[in-house]
A protein has these predicted regions:
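Helix N-cap motif at beta-to-alpha junctions
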Residues: 58-64
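Short active-site oxyanion
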Residues: 52-55, 77
């Protein structure tokens, strides 16, 4: 399986203006994140103290990754980077 580092940031213009609405939305989103962590779909997740940016480690196919991130669009923007394990990188280096 391919491993991805997914960084994300909130789109300010798409965030609810009222704090009560923001809390409700964020709690709903966090339920899906916690479910993905429990199921193993996400390997790790972190969020900055301001709640406006963070990261996730996802392992799977490109399609599964797209399906996971699309549920948060247009509220968040994502950048995905394919990651190699240490062993994979050693293999690359040995074949240079």
């Amino acid at each position: 399986m391919t491993r991805y580092l997914v960084t994300w940031k909130a789109v300010n213009a798409r965030q609810p203006e009222k704090i009560e609405d923001r809390v409700k939305q964020d709690l709903k989103f966090m339920e899906t994140i916690q479910d993905a962590l429990k199921s193993g779909a996400l390997k790790d997740y972190g969020i900055a103290p301001d709640g406006m940016k963070g990261y996730a480690i996802f392992e799977g196919t490109e399609t599964a990754g797209a399906m996971m991130t699309q549920m948060y669009v247009p509220f968040y923007e994502f950048e995905e980077t394919t990651m190699l394990t240490a062993d994979q990188w050693v293999e690359v280096l040995k074949n240079l």
